[in-house]
Curated annotation (Swiss-Prot):
GO terms for molecular function: catalytic activity; mRNA 3'-UTR binding. InterPro entries: ANGEL2_N, CCR4/nocturin_mRNA_transcr, Endo/exonu/phosph_ase_sf, Endo/exonuclease/phosphatase. One of its GO terms (biological process) is mitochondrial mRNA 3'-end processing. Pfam families: ANGEL2_N, Exo_endo_phos. PANTHER family: CARBON CATABOLITE REPRESSOR PROTEIN 4 (PTHR12121), PROTEIN ANGEL HOMOLOG 2 (PTHR12121:SF27). It comes from Mus musculus (Mouse). This is Protein angel homolog 2. Belongs to the CCR4/nocturin family. GO terms for cellular component: Cajal body; mitochondrial matrix.
């Protein structure tokens, strides 16, 4: 990776020149190591010579303690408050890249600090306060919209019925320690002690214990920590854990953990998005799909599909993101498919690295996407400009992937009910190919699920955008809980071809926060919240 350095040339002008050193010449392996930064020396040098203008560019302010922007959850419109002049309000763009303004970037090759006294004031401040997150109850007859988080009795506000199964689901990107250290520039606003795993894990475990969700969908679960700390701790809380590590040399993966007192495990279905025989799919992201059966005092109960994923981050590779999503949806369709054409309820969680209103997000909710003429950098809504980017190819993925434009496996075997000699011939006849659009070069993607988002992504009363991640370079929404909602006299959507058995009713959700809220406690991570993501939590009702 080429880096940029600042060079002073005549009249105090600063131009960008290519440096021959990597941006991170000494990888940060321990957060206890001293940090050094030539930026502050350069800043003082320029200030003394009245050439501070050489360090300015659109979007830059002199009070900023760092001069460049990041690569992880990048958003030009989201910066810590001390990057803004007084009175400047954060503008949450309408998730369209053509609404974003261009900005010049200057990168320095070193960005670490020498000692505590060199830390910015915002970093040295201790924020002992916490922000209370409220439950938002969504039952139509509920007179009270929200209650304090400490009030755990959700059922008291909702309709009480015998033929029901209520359960809660949490989605939480817990921030892999290796990824934190490899991307330490994203956490320069943090005090170093709060970044140590020995400090973070007890906080994360405390959150999990407090919320006491029936199902956990965790992302960025580091393999070594999972085996030695995370899994044993969760098992002691009554969870059964399933884990899928990313392929290649990636240190983390996804886990789905459920209370074995509430569910039985029917199947585990990992999904590897990397396919060595397909050049497009050279990334190591994964998904994990579980089929669970509620433990209820009935002879038979409908199963529930829980899916968890962490899609590729790269804002300019929307083609890979869409293909990864299609692979996950195909596996979900395969797991939930029934002979009568119905599908069991689905809860799909994860870090989708896409913003609300983006083409990828809209595809999940609407069940269809026409990607003709769409630039690959606009798929996730993270990229500000499509200049220099190619248009998505038609089709996006090659035929040998084995997934149709309807996001199902092109050939799948329908399992027979009984294994008898007379069924041998029948089993061969039951091999059926899922119908695929006759137009093999169609630019239309579809999927057969009617999915809704647990969150509306805006604060109801003010319209201020909610965020699920907040660090030194970004404050946006990338984490979601999608579910197949119970249809109650609603218009048929793109996923109407799937007849839901029961469906899910959203009872309550744990409120999210705004960027302004989070910076009152110095962003994420902080003394009380030990990931750069907020946990998402929802309570559902399965009507039997």
């Amino acid at each position: 990776m080429e880096t940029w350095r600042c060079v002073r040339r005549g009249y105090g002008r600063c131009v960008a020149g290519r440096g021959r050193y990597s941006m991170f010449p000494y990888p940060l392996k321990s957060l206890g190591r001293d940090w050094t930064t030539p930026w502050e020396d350069l800043q003082k040098y320029c200030w003394r010579r009245h050439i501070s203008s050489c360090l300015r560019w659109p979007g830059h302010y002199s009070r900023a303690p760092y001069p460049y922007f990041s690569s992880r959850h990048f958003s030009l419109n989201c910066r810590p408050p001390f990057l803004f002049e007084s009175g400047t309000q954060f503008q949450y763009y309408n998730w369209r890249s053509d609404h974003l303004s261009n900005a010049s970037l200057i990168h320095l090759s070193r960005h670490v600090m020498t000692s505590d006294r060199d830390e910015p004031l915002s970093k040295r401040r201790k924020h002992q306060g916490t922000i209370k997150r409220n439950w938002e109850y969504l039952c139509s007859h509920n007179k009270e919209n929200t209650k304090d988080l400490e009030d755990r009795n959700v059922d008291s506000t909702c309709e009480d019925r015998e033929d029901k199964f209520d359960f809660s689901v949490m989605s939480y990107n817990i921030l892999s320690q290796d990824l934190l250290e490899d991307n330490s520039h994203l956490y320069r606003h943090c005090r170093r002690p709060v970044l140590h795993w020995s400090f973070r894990f007890p906080n994360i475990l405390k959150e999990i214990k407090h919320f006491d969700a029936d199902v956990l969908c965790l992302q960025e679960v580091q393999e070594d920590h999972y085996g030695t700390e995370i899994r044993p701790s969760l098992e002691s809380l009554g969870y059964h854990c399933e884990y899928k590590m990313k392929t290649g040399r990636k240190p983390d993966g996804c886990a789905i953990c459920f209370k074995h007192s509430r569910f039985s495990l029917l199947s585990v279905n990992p999904v590897e998005f990397c396919r060595r025989d397909i050049p497009l799919l050279d990334r190591d992201n994964i998904g994990l799909v579980l089929l669970l059966q509620p433990k209820i005092p009935r002879a038979a109960s409908p199963s529930i599909c829980i899916a968890n994923t962490h899609l590729l981050y790269n804002p300019r590779r929307g083609d890979i993101k869409l293909t990864q999503l299609a692979m996950l949806l195909a596996e979900i369709a395969n797991v939930t498919h029934r002979k009568d054409g119905s599908s069991c309820p689905i809860v799909m969680c994860g870090d989708f690295n896409s913003v609300p209103g983006s083409p990828l997000y809209s595809f999940i909710k609407e069940g269809k996407l026409n990607y003709e003429g769409l630039a690959i950098g606009k798929v996730s809504g993270q990229e500000q400009s499509s200049r220099g980017q190619r248009i998505l190819s038609i089709p996006i993925w090659p035929p040998n992937l084995g997934i149709s434009q309807n996001c199902v496996y092109e050939a799948q075997q329908v399992p027979k009910v009984e294994k008898t000699d007379s069924d041998v011939t029948q089993a061969q006849q039951e091999k059926a190919e899922v119908p695929v659009s006759a137009d093999k070069v169609s630019s239309h993607l579809q999927h057969g699920f009617s999915l809704s988002s647990v969150y509306s992504h805006y604060v109801p009363d003010t319209g201020v955008p909610e965020v699920t991640t907040c660090h030194s370079r970004s404050a946006i929404t990338v984490d979601y809980i999608f579910y197949t909602a119970k249809k109650e006299n609603t218009a048929q959507g793109p996923g109407a071809e799937v007849a839901l058995v029961g469906g899910l009713k959203l009872l309550a959700r744990l409120s999210l926060l705004t960027e302004q809220d989070l910076w009152t406690v110095n962003g994420l991570p902080n003394e009380h919240n030990s990931s750069d993501h907020l946990p998402l939590l929802a309570k559902f009702r399965l009507e039997l």
